[in-house]
From Swiss-Prot:
This is Alternative oxidase, mitochondrial. Residues 53-81 are annotated as: Disordered. PANTHER family: ALTERNATIVE OXIDASE (PTHR31803:SF3). Belongs to the alternative oxidase family. It is an enzyme of class 1 (oxidoreductase). It comes from the Eukaryota. It comes from Cryptococcus neoformans var. grubii serotype A (strain H99 / ATCC 208821 / CBS 10515 / FGSC 9487).
Length: 401
């Protein structure tokens, strides 16, 4: 490489470090020849070494070596570790379909019928003290929530279901069934709270990334996706519900208390916070499974053949003929995903590991039938997805035949 000639040492130093192009045409070059300086390879190497000394603490070689000595991490540094670049993704003209309004700002889930049927009620047995504390807290909150909403996990006997007609009014009067309005009351309260953890975690990790002057490893985006997904659940059910003053007051009070409590929990122990959310989502899947069972058994006649709201058809890319039952099944699949992701994140090193789901989601079958990944499974999954992404990127750019 030919020597780089510039007007002054200061300009040369800043230009080399920035890696930017040389500015100026032939006239500028000729006028500078008599007063130029030539930098040898040794000088340029010294300039670059000086630059590392002035780097942020997290980028200095000694700090990076110390981090490596602590053991392996989930994920790795390098290209594509926090998700695909927009230029690496295959473009799709969603506006060609008149029934859609375009892509949503963040990831929005799309399921097949088979994938929706894979969702199961599963749970992770608590192991550590933190796990047990999170699990017991969720169980206590669940009991309080059931009492507030009048919910009873009652399974109607087959003999009662065989009656024509089914004594729905009698079952509701005995507190064994929820009416459509009580289901909406319960769901709206649940979803108004469920959108808090992702936003809290994303906010705190965003601030941590800026505070430490280092990248986050893909955690922020997944947590914000979770928060938006839960908010879309709330907006969907708001299209068929008209909350009164009492419901709005409860939402305001519950959200204010829960946000601050979860904020403090995440500051103290992100691991316990994610375990708490994983356990909370287990209960959400259980609740929606009960709701689906009641709808399929004809125990909520007000929702029979009710069409899916337009916002739900657009968000989940559902067929135009979809019903409210299809929407609730999609919501349950989302909750199973949050259960899977948060339990998996709780198993990671909260300060050093990369988010294994920054590159790609696990398969819907796994998300629906497993409580989550162990740390070893997360490391394997992250490596596999990074290799797939790199191979696809190289193939699309013509580097591989």
């Amino acid at each position: 490489m030919s020597a780089i000639m510039l007007r002054s040492g200061n300009v040369a130093r800043s230009t080399i470090l920035a890696g930017g192009p040389l500015i100026g045409g032939p006239m500028t070059f000729r006028s500078a020849v008599s007063s130029t300086r030539t930098f040898s390879l040794f000088t340029k190497a010294r300039i670059q070494s000086d630059d590392m000394k002035r780097a942020s603490l997290s980028l200095q070689p000694s700090v990076r070596e110390a981090e490596k000595s602590q053991g392996p991490v989930v994920g790795s540094e390098g290209r594509g570790v926090e998700g695909p670049h927009y230029q690496d993704q295959v473009s799709h003209n969603v506006l060609s379909d008149a029934s859609t309004t375009g892509a949503w700002t963040m990831f929005n889930p799309i399921y097949t019928e088979k994938e929706l049927n894979t969702v199961q009620v599963v749970g992770r047995a608590p192991v550590t003290f933190g796990d047990k504390a999170a699990h017991r807290t969720v169980k206590f909150l669940r009991k309080c929530f059931d009492l507030l909403t009048g919910y009873t996990p009652y399974e109607v006997p087959a003999s009662v279901l065989a009656q024509k007609p089914i004594p729905i009014a009698e079952l509701r009067s005995k507190g064994k069934l929820l009416s459509d309005q009580k289901w909406l009351f319960r769901i709206i309260l649940l979803e108004s709270i469920a959108g808090v953890p992702g936003m809290v975690g994303g906010t705190l990790r965003h601030l941590r990334s800026m505070r430490l002057l280092k990248r986050d490893g893909g955690w922020i985006h997944s947590l914000l996706e979770e928060a938006e997904n839960e908010r879309m659940h709330l907006l969907t059910f708001m299209t068929i519900a008209q909350p009164g003053i009492f419901t709005r007051a409860l939402v305001l009070a519950a959200q204010g208390v829960f946000y601050n409590a979860f904020f403090l929990t995440y500051l103290i122990s992100p691991r316990i916070a994610h375990r708490f959310v994983g356990a909370l989502e287990e209960e959400a899947v259980r609740t929606y499974t009960h709701c689906i069972s009641d709808m399929e058994a004809g125990l909520i006649p007000e929702w029979k053949d009710m069409p899916a709201p337009a916002i739900a058809i657009d968000y989940w890319r559902l067929p135009a003929s979809s019903s409210l039952l299809d929407v609730i099944r999609a919501v349950r699949a989302d909750e199973a995903t949050h259960r899977f992701v948060n339990h998996s994140l709780a198993n990671l090193d909260q300060k050093r590991d990369f988010n294994p789901f920054a590159l790609s989601e696990a398969s819907p079958e796994e998300r629906g039938s497993k409580w989550g990944y162990t740390r070893e499974e997360s490391a394997k999954f992250a490596l596999e997805q990074q290799r797939k992404l790199m191979a696809a990127s190289e193939k699309s750019s013509g580097l591989v035949e």
